[in-house]
């Protein structure tokens, strides 16, 4: 089909012998002529070199699969803001297992029961025993409060988050995940529970496993497609096999070289390996088609096989080198990007293209030498040249029509690219049948979408934030955050349940005080009668104490008489002397009877009137004023003795003495009388001593003090009654005031509910205990255990441990939103949350704090930001590299400009087709990595066809651009078509992958290559070249070498002067190839490839 597609066209030469001028070096100089001679002389050496190289690398260098497991690709750079904040939060809270998390979903469609819970506990125990692979486990066995959160509303599923060691995607994390998966499968087997593993760690594991499974299937599909296309093109099995042998050998070598780069630190992703295989097959086959087609051209012109190989390598080698350099340099330039997938795939593809290029210009020519000498790869008749010649004629005749039609199609398709919506959710790239996808489906069925995707507001400060003021400022900050659209709840130290801590609001606290005041007011009102009784009792006591004073005064007078009589009796009868004299003093008998009568009367009165002494003594005992007054205290002591004398019978004994005196008779013997009196008198004297009456004067003074104390008590009781009455009046007034105050405070509690009105305050004592900053919470006073009627310190302590770092310098809040955490809306929300939080910082305790958001939406947002940055970098870098190479190759300015423009439009059109197919028809958003990766490949590969087309056009334009376009389209149409089909087939082979991102990328690349092959290179670019004319080759005079002159313009004028036909058909068919081929690089100093 393409055997003679590269056959040069002989056209009539101008009469001027331009070829005699030293414009160009002959075909004998340069790298490729010498390389061709070497290969023709030593083909077996070249083949042996490649076989030895592959044989050396294959057993000594680990496979690319093994290296991809050791050196996985981190999507974001290590200094990405979200990763920095995550590491800081992990360090501040001394946590592990946050970077790599797997989630076990345990479900029972019949409802969770006791048997399920036993299985759950056994699984938890097994996981806790695996301390190597499990660094964090959130279960409700050890933390009962988590039960409600970890149980679905329909009571059919539990979730069990498991933290794994290492970063997400690391070798350590992958190995730990595999062992944890085995534990889960073993423990749940045979139970009523169904276990599914999901979460970020499971997603990464499934991405790697799916990529590995897809690779062999993709390679097989690509091989079959290439065999079919090559068989159609060459219709020769040997010719068809040669490119495959070359590509197979180059793949082995390239994979081991990339593995060496991986050992040196280059990250390897499974998706990159897949694209690497497709790119190597496509590029290698393209280079083989270019070389074999030119080889067939020279064979048709009569050259033998060895000469044809040398000439083909000399002429087309330069184009292949320029094409490979464009692609490789562009790919290597991707090392300057930030995203891991782009940063690593660039060097991988660059190395691969370089290996394929060297195999195409060394191994393939050597194989062609050996097979060509035996005539195994002879060309077949061209079947498409007439079609492409006719196409060229139509374009030359109506260039504007063809340009407008093709441009309209491209612009419409490119416009669809602007409607693309990009997906950053890697879950959607996986097939629904993998383990993590099944787990996510179970989660979506039983739980909210954002349950296992935590998002934190992280605040770091140089000062301790465990103060009432800082917490109040934090509450104001998160209150603003909670008002951001889409934020459903913000939980943290100041709002454990997602709402501002009610007990810490000053309005609530004022309301509590008001409640207490209202309670006091009601109690006062309810006990008004009791208070009145108190006042009446005080008045009654004062009245009774007045009566007691009167009785005491009367009793004191009688006691005074008794004391005088006893004193007289003591003086009269005291001692043995007096008693001795009684026997001779009968005259005293009458006096003794009279004295007995007096004593009996007084003693009886005292005994009958001392009931007042006990209450008086009790009042004096409880009086601090009497205790402080020495005189009152002494009188209280004497009164105590009087009460004691009454109680212990002393007064009774005095009465007995009186009765004996009264009983004295004259008929009695004096001795008997005296003997009885002596005994009685001795008893009385002892009793008087116990009463302190040994000194009558002292007793009388003490009795006077008692009298005075009773008078003071009576006076004081009257004053007490007046004071109690005053107190009662004041309490009643205070009760009315408490009612008014409580009404005001309760109204404030009910109405001041907004943060600005309510305020926020946690007492320092409670905060100190709760955060463990001072005394342990268990030792705090009971009045703080349940401060202000509800703020329990034990609950607050658990909350503080989760949201306040041990040093108090970092605080985080858990943010729950109504949005899908993988959606672009969730990513856009991050800026709003951050702005709201930072807007609350000025003039607060948080003014110098660092505020950031941590979580998956932030990771995806940073991924999008880096992707946008990298896409701009890739576009600028790729355009500059390709443009510079085209300028150097063509030694012109205008043609490279519209060529690069056509490549960009072609890329946008291909992306637009992808949007139409996947987004509009299939309802899938485009994966975020598609624009950057496809741009590099489409522009770089499109540059290959540009170089082949425009270089041949410049060669053929010596007799005019219009005729040059016809001959160029006729001669290169088949080659470009074949190359485009082969490269597109290589890309379409990736459609057999299971990963959605690979399928989308493959479709866009394959479609873009076909679009570039059949529309841009065969219609749009030739039409532009015809319209631009000789200006295609314009170059500023300052850039022109000394020997440069516009060949096309001078020869074109000569041709137009002669008015020759555009296509001298006979000469065209017989024209030999031009040894001094204009295609390739040529510098004025004589150096060339």
Curated annotation (Swiss-Prot):
Region (Disordered): 1-26, 1056-1078
UniProt feature, compositional bias: Acidic residues: 1066-1078
InterPro entries named in the record: MMPL_dom, MmpL_fam, Mycobact_MmpL, SSD
TM regions (residue ranges): 44-64, 222-242, 257-277, 316-336, 349-369, 400-420, 555-575, 874-894, 898-918, 930-950, 973-993, 996-1016
Top-rank taxon, per record: Bacteria
Entry GO terms, CC: plasma membrane
Pfam families from the UniProt entry: MMPL
Subcellular location, record wording: Cell membrane
Gene3D superfamilies membership: Multidrug efflux transporter AcrB transmembrane domain (1.20.1640.10)
UniProt main location, coarse: membrane
Family membership noted in the UniProt record: Belongs to the resistance-nodulation-cell division (RND) (TC 2.A.6) family. MmpL subfamily.
PANTHER family found in the cross-reference section: MEMBRANE PROTEIN MJ1562-RELATED, MEMBRANE PROTEIN YDGH-RELATED
Additional facts recorded: In strain BCG, the sulfolipid-1 (SL-1) is not synthesized.
Protein name as it appears in the record: Probable transport protein MmpL8
Organism: Mycobacterium bovis (strain BCG / Pasteur 1173P2)
Gene behind this protein: mmpL8
């Amino acid at each position: 089909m393409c055997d003679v597609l590269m056959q040069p066209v002989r056209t009539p030469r101008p009469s001027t012998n331009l070829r005699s001028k030293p414009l160009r070096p002959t075909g004998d100089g340069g790298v490729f002529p010498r390389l061709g001679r070497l290969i023709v002389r030593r083909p077996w050496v070249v083949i042996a070199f490649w076989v030895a190289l592959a044989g050396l690398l294959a057993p000594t260098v680990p496979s690319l699969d093994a290296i991809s497991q050791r050196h996985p690709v981190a999507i974001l750079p290590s200094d990405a803001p979200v990763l920095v904040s995550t590491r800081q939060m992990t360090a501040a809270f001394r946590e592990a297992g946050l970077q790599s998390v797997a989630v076990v979903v345990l479900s029972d469609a019949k409802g969770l029961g006791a048997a399920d819970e036993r299985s759950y506990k056994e699984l938890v125990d097994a996981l806790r025993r695996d301390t190597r692979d499990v660094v964090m486990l959130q279960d409700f066995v050890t933390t009962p409060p988590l039960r409600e959160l970890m149980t679905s509303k329909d009571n059919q599923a539990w979730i069990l988050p498991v933290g794994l060691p290492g970063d997400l995607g690391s070798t350590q994390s992958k190995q730990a995940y595999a062992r944890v998966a085995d534990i889960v499968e073993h423990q749940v087997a045979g139970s009523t529970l169904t276990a599914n593993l999901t979460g970020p760690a499971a997603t990464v594991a499934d991405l790697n496993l799916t990529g590995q499974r897809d690779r062999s299937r993709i390679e097989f599909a690509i091989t079959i497609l290439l065999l079919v296309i090559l068989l159609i093109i060459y219709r020769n099995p040997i010719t068809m096999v040669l490119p495959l042998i070359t590509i197979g050998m180059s793949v082995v070598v390239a994979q081991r070289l990339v593995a060496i780069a991986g050992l040196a630190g280059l990250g390897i992703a499974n998706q990159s390996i897949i694209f690497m295989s497709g790119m190597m097959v496509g590029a290698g086959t393209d280079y083989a088609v270019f070389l074999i087609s030119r080889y067939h051209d020279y064979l048709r012109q009569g050259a033998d096989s060895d000469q044809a190989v040398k000439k083909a390598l000399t002429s087309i080698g330069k184009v292949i080198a320029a094409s490979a350099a464009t692609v490789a340099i562009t790919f290597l330039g991707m090392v300057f990007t930030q995203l891991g997938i782009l940063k690593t795939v660039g060097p991988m593809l660059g190395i691969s293209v370089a290996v394929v290029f060297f195999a195409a210009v060394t191994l393939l020519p050597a194989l062609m030498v050996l097979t060509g000498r035996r005539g195994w790869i002879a060309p077949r008749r061209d079947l498409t040249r007439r079609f492409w010649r006719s196409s060229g004629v139509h374009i030359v005749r109506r260039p504007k029509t063809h340009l407008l039609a093709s441009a309209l199609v491209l612009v419409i398709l490119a416009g669809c690219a602007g409607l693309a919506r990009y997906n950053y959710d890697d879950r959607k790239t996986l097939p629904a049948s993998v383990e993590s996808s099944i787990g996510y489906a179970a989660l979506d069925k039983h739980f909210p979408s954002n349950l296992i995707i935590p998002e934190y507001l992280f605040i770091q400060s140089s000062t301790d934030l465990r103060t009432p003021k800082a917490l109040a400022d934090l509450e104001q900050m998160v209150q603003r955050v909670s008002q951001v659209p889409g934020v459903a709840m913000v939980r943290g130290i100041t709002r454990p349940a997602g709402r501002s801590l009610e007990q810490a609001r000053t309005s609530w606290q004022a309301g509590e005080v008001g409640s207490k005041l209202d309670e006091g007011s009601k109690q006062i009102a309810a006990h008004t009668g009791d208070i009145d009784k108190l006042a009446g009792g005080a008045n009654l006591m004062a009245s009774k104490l007045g009566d007691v004073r009167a009785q005491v005064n009367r009793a004191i007078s009688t006691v005074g008489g008794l004391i005088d009589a006893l004193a007289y009796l003591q003086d009269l009868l005291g001692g043995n002397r007096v008693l001795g004299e009684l026997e001779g003093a009968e005259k005293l008998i009458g006096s003794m009877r009279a004295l007995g009568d007096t004593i009996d009367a007084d003693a009886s009165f005292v005994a009958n009137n001392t009931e007042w002494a006990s209450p008086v003594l009790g009042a004096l005992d409880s009086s601090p004023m009497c205790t402080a007054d020495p005189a009152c205290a002494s009188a209280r002591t004497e009164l105590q003795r009087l009460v004691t004398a009454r109680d212990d019978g002393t007064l009774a004994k005095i009465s007995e003495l009186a009765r004996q005196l009264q009983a004295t008779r004259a008929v009695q013997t004096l001795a008997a009388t005296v003997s009885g009196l002596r005994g009685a008198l001795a008893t009385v004297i002892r009793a008087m001593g116990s009463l302190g009456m040994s000194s009558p004067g002292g007793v009388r003074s003490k009795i006077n003090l008692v009298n005075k104390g009773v008078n003071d008590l009576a006076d004081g009781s009257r004053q007490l009654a007046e004071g109690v009455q005053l107190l009662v009046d004041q309490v009643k007034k205070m009760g009315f005031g408490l009612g008014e105050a409580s009404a005001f405070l309760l109204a404030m509690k009910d109405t001041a509910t907004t943060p600005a009105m309510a305020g926020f305050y946690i007492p320092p004592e409670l905060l100190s205990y709760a955060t463990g900053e001072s005394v342990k919470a268990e030792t705090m006073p009971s009045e703080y255990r349940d401060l202000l009627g509800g703020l329990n310190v034990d609950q607050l302590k658990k909350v503080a441990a989760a949201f306040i770092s041990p040093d108090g310098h970092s605080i985080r809040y858990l943010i729950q939103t109504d949005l899908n955490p993988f959606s672009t809306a969730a990513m856009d929300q991050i800026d709003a949350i951050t702005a709201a939080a930072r807007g609350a910082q000025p003039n607060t305790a948080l003014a110098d704090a660092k505020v950031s958001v941590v979580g998956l939406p932030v990771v995806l947002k940073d991924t999008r930001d880096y992707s946008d940055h990298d896409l701009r970098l890739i576009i600028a870098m790729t355009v500059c590299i390709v443009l510079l190479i085209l300028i150097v190759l063509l030694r012109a300015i205008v043609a490279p400009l519209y060529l690069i423009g056509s490549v960009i439009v072609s890329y946008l059109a291909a992306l637009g087709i992808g949007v139409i197919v996947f987004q509009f028809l299939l309802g899938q958003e485009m994966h975020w990595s598609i624009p950057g990766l496809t741009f590099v490949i489409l522009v770089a590969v499109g540059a290959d066809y540009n170089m082949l087309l425009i270089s041949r056009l410049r060669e053929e334009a010596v007799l005019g651009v219009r005729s040059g376009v016809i001959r160029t389209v006729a001669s290169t149409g088949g080659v470009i078509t074949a190359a485009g089909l082969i490269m597109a087939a290589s890309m379409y082979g990736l459609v057999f992958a299971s990963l959605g991102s690979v399928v989308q990328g493959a479709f866009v690349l394959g479609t873009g290559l076909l679009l570039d092959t059949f529309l841009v290179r065969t219609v749009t670019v030739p039409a532009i070249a015809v319209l631009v004319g000789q200006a295609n080759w314009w170059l500023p005079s300052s850039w022109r070498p000394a020997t440069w002159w516009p060949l096309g313009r001078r020869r074109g004028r000569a041709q137009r002067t002669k008015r020759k036909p555009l296509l001298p058909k006979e000469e065209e068919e017989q024209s030999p190839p031009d040894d001094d081929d204009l295609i390739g690089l040529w510098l004025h100093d004589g150096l060339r490839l």
